C-alpha cells in the first residue's frame, strides 16, 4: 500500500484493490471524459448542466440551447455524443454524454481543494459532510432526478461501463478524501458498498421528496449512513455485510421502479 505522499507518475485510469494516491491525481482531462476543460464539448455540457437541465431535464433540448448560447451550430450535437456507442435503450448518444458528464464533473468538484497528502486526517471533512455536499449539488435538478435514475437503471452497456463504475469511484473518493478510517483488507469493499448503498438510497428518496429544500432527504441520508456504517461494525463476516448492502441497494431500486 503506497503512502499518500508517494510520487505520482505514469498514472492510468483504473481502480486498484485499495485506495491509492495515484488514483486521486487531479488530471488535465477529467477521466473517463475524453475531452479537457477548454474543449467545446466541455463548455457546452457544463453550461447545459448548470443553466438548461434544471428547466428542460436531461434532453437534447438542453444541449441545443447551450450550443445556441455559446454560438455553436446545432449540428455539433452529433459530435458531443460521439464517445458513446449507439444504444437501443437510450434515444440519444448526446444525452448519454450529458448524463456521464454530470456524474463525472460533480464527483471531481466534490473534492476540489481537499488534499489528504498535506492535511492532517482530523482536519479532513467527515464522510457525512461529503455525502450531504454531493446531494446538495443535485438540488437544482431535483425535479428531474426520477428521469435521471430511470436512465441510469436501464440494463445496457452504459449502466455497466459508466453508471456503476462512477458510483464506485464516487464512494471511493468520499472515503479517501474524508477523515473516515479506511481498511486495507476485504472490509475495503464492504465500506464502499455501504456508502454506495447510502448514496443510491438517498438519491431515490430525493427523487420523491416534496419537503422544503429537500430537508427530509438530508435527514434520511444522515440516518441511513449512520445505520449502514454502524451495522457494518457489528458484522464480523465482511462478505456477509457486503452482500447485505448490495441487496439492500438492489431491493430499494426495484421497489422505487415498481412505484413508477
From Swiss-Prot:
InterPro entries, alphabetized: COQ9_C (IPR013718), Ubiq_biosynth_COQ9 (IPR012762)
One GO process term, biological-process aspect: ubiquinone biosynthetic process
GO CC field: mitochondrial inner membrane; mitochondrion; protein-containing complex
Pathway stated in the Swiss-Prot or TrEMBL entry: Cofactor biosynthesis; ubiquinone biosynthesis
Cellular compartment(s): Mitochondrion inner membrane
Record has RNA-binding as a keyword: no
Main location: mitochondrion
Membrane topology: Peripheral membrane protein
Domain of life: Eukaryota
Pfam family, one: COQ9
UniProt KW keywords: Lipid-binding, Membrane, Mitochondrion, Mitochondrion inner membrane, Transit peptide, Ubiquinone biosynthesis
Presence of the UniProt keyword Mitochondrion in the record: yes
GO molecular function: lipid binding
Effect of residue 174 to E: Impaired ability to grow on nonfermentable carbon sources
Residues bound to a 1,2-diacylglycero-3-phosphoethanolamine: 189-192
Record's function text: Membrane-associated protein that warps the membrane surface to access and bind aromatic isoprenes with high specificity, including ubiquinone (CoQ) isoprene intermediates and presents them directly to COQ7, therefore facilitating the COQ7-mediated hydroxylase step. Participates in the biosynthesis of coenzyme Q, also named ubiquinone, an essential lipid-soluble electron transporter for aerobic cellular respiration.
NCBIfam families hit by this protein: diverge_rpsU
More details: Present with 3420 molecules/cell in log phase SD medium.
Protein family per UniProt: Belongs to the COQ9 family.
Protein name: Ubiquinone biosynthesis protein COQ9, mitochondrial
Gene source species: Saccharomyces cerevisiae (strain ATCC 204508 / S288c) (Baker's yeast)
